[in-house]
């Protein structure tokens, strides 16, 4: 998708900034719940900049505008930003961070404004300090200025119905989860926990929604104390079945009343603290480090609030047996769907010489997936990319702006689905003609990295930060690399990107150790701008493994892969694989055949394709 002219939007925004005596205005990607994926009504950064990627921050001064994003989106942003914008490439040498660039624009006593509901309290403090060093100041602007520019064209906030997530898939009742949470709160001697992250609320109450595309969550807040559980949600979203399910164990309150109630709680905590002996530390409310500045301020700020990594995030990341079994089951069905799709696509392109574009193909994949048990929808927008488009890491094909699939070029498909029993995310790179030697080399080096993570054995306490290099080592030896993380946590019929664990160089991945029950993607890649892109992605689950020795008496961990989709035999150069790696590929393909071939007893086309693609190398 090419650039749109943002001149009028920026001019109107600058008028509003001038009226409010704001010199620089920040437009984050996130919504008021700090969601990575957002509802259309919260797409403020996309509206003002024209950049449609899921990550980034826009900064507008009276004379300049900048967009900062990470390596996944450099190519996309360069294509989508018009001449009004400067692209700040995050992580590039000699390139300022968006915070540094903002501070530069604030030199000489200028005021930087931001909607306090769209930035975390932690980030607001750090940003304020950075700006102060340049002589500027940070101001929370309660009225969102981009919303005013957007006006009546801004989409309405979704209000979809909420549904129960059955215990057979959740594995634990919401009463048990709240009880576990209260034990954690008791350990921390706090007054309660104010929850703002949407996936945490959905997980805690065993509820699912449809307010954000691809993410089965709903707009809500919650406050849990030792004696109360309050859910802040628009009541019309709750069917009678859900209200009966929650019963008298949960008090329902209007979504919009959270900030007033937070102010009351904050004042109450302060009054209680003031009235007690000074030797007794005051009980604070916990909020996530991802909670908004607005929420922190409503509770009374730092004197009443302790920011922590959410105990719900930690609990949610360790899947129980029902969730793990669901992930295994849904990936078998999803693998069958992908095999059917790839067999169909090859037949159409090679045998029938059908002309298909990238969107035609992704639509067919969704149609095939939708036939399978427990299918709800996609878990993200399918990346269906041919040739040079595959080098755009988060490429998005549009109906009126996409390419015809070239059977003589690399085809990269990164896709996933939401099933009642789990969430999938799989990437396969294929070639329907004769790949070049460089394409085969790149694919095989990426495959070696994937196998290295899959077969890794490591002591308890090891982080995803430490494991990341396992996946890159073979590319590094050739002077190659990729500009994205190696893996992210995956939810159980929840967000496809889930913290706090992952594989990569982000600071957060050095803070939390991999633990049994974690579900993570394993997705190394390699990209040549304007030529081709390679990525292979499996979902893996951490587990305890037996070792010959047990140094330090620690448990040792490894992974179980659950993705059941064949690799592309045509792109593998066996001479670059060790005997152990060849055995891994052959064993993996045997497992795929055994688990998915039953779906094709009456589908000769797919069965023959699957048989061919799972032959020993």
UniProtKB/Swiss-Prot annotation:
Molecular function GO terms recorded: metal ion binding; metalloaminopeptidase activity
Residues that coordinate or bind Mn(2+) 2: 414, 425, 537
Keywords recorded for this protein, A-Z: Aminopeptidase, Hydrolase, Manganese, Metal-binding, Metalloprotease, Protease
Domain of life assignment: Eukaryota
CDD domains attached to this UniProt entry: APP
Principal EC category: hydrolase
Recorded GO CC terms: cytoplasm
Cofactor(s) this protein cannot do without: Mn(2+)
Signal peptide: none
UniProt xrefs under Pfam families: Creatinase_N (PF01321), Creatinase_N_2 (PF16189), Peptidase_M24 (PF00557), Peptidase_M24_C (PF16188)
Gene Ontology biological process: proteolysis
PANTHER family tied to this protein: XAA-PRO AMINOPEPTIDASE 1 (PTHR43763:SF6)
Protein name from the UniProt record: Probable Xaa-Pro aminopeptidase P
């Amino acid at each position: 998708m090419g650039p749109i002219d943002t001149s009028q939007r920026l001019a109107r925004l600058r008028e509003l900034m001038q009226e409010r005596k704001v010199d620089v205005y920040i437009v984050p990607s996130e919504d008021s719940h700090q969601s990575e994926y957002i509802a259309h009504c919260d797409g403020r950064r996309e509206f003002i900049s024209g950049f449609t990627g899921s990550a980034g921050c826009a900064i507008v001064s009276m004379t300049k505008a900048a967009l900062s994003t990470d390596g996944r989106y450099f190519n996309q942003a360069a294509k989508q930003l018009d001449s009004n914008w400067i692209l700040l490439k995050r992580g590039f040498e000699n390139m300022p961070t968006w915070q540094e660039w903002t501070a530069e624009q604030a030199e000489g006593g200028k005021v930087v404004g931001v909607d306090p509901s769209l930035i975390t309290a932690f980030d607001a403090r750090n940003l304020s300090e950075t700006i102060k060093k340049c002589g500027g100041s940070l101001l929370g602007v309660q009225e969102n200025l981009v919303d005013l520019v957007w006006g009546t064209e801004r989409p309405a906030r979704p209000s979809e119905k909420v549904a129960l997530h059955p215990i057979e898939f959740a594995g634990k009742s919401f009463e048990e989860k709240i009880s576990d949470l209260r034990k954690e709160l008791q350990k921390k001697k706090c007054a309660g926990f104010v929850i703002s992250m949407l996936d945490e609320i959905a997980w805690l109450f065993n509820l699912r929604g449809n307010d954000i595309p691809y993410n089965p969550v709903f707009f809500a807040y919650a406050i849990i104390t030792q004696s109360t559980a309050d859910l802040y949600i628009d009541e019309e979203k709750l069917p009678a079945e859900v209200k009966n399910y929650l019963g008298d164990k949960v008090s329902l309150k209007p979504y919009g009343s959270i900030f007033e109630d937070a102010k009351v709680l904050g004042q109450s905590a302060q009054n209680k603290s003031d009235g007690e002996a000074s030797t007794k530390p005051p009980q604070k409310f916990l909020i996530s480090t991802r909670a908004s500045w607005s929420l922190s301020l409503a509770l009374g700020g730092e004197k009443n609030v302790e920011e922590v990594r959410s105990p719900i995030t930690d609990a949610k990341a360790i899947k129980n047996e029902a969730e793990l079994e669901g992930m295994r089951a849904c990936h078998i069905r999803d693998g069958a769907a992908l095999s059917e799709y790839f067999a169909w696509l090859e037949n159409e392109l090679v045998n029938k010489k059908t002309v298909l574009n990238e969107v035609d193909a992704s639509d067919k994949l969704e149609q095939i997936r939708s036939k399978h048990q427990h299918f709800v929808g996609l878990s993200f927008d399918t990346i269906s990319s041919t040739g040079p488009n595959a080098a755009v890491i988060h490429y998005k094909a549009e109906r009126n702006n996409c390419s015809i699939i070239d059977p003589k070029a690399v085809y990269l498909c990164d896709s996933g689905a939401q099933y009642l029993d789990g969430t999938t995310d799989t990437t396969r790179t294929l070639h329907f003609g004769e790949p070049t030697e460089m394409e085969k080399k790149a694919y095989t080096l990426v495959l070696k990295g994937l196998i290295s993570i899959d077969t890794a054995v490591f002591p308890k306490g090891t982080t995803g930060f430490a494991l990341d290099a396992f996946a890159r080592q073979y590319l590094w030896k050739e002077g190659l690399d990729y500009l994205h993380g190696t893996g992210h946590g995956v939810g159980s019929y929840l967000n496809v990107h889930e913290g706090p664990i992952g594989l990569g160089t982000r600071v957060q991945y050095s803070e939390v150790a991999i633990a049994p029950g974690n579900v993570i993607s394993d997705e190394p890649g390699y990209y040549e701008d304007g030529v081709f892109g390679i990525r292979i992605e499996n979902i893996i689950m951490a587990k305890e493994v037996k070792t010959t020795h047990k140094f330090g008496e620690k448990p040792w961990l490894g992974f179980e892969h659950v993705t059941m989709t064949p690799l592309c035999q045509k792109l593998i150069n066996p001479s670059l694989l060790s005997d152990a790696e060849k055995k891994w590929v052959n064993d993996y393909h045997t497992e795929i055949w055994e688990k998915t071939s039953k779906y094709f007893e009456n589908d000769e086309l797919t069965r023959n394709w699957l048989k061919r693609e799972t032959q020993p190398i």
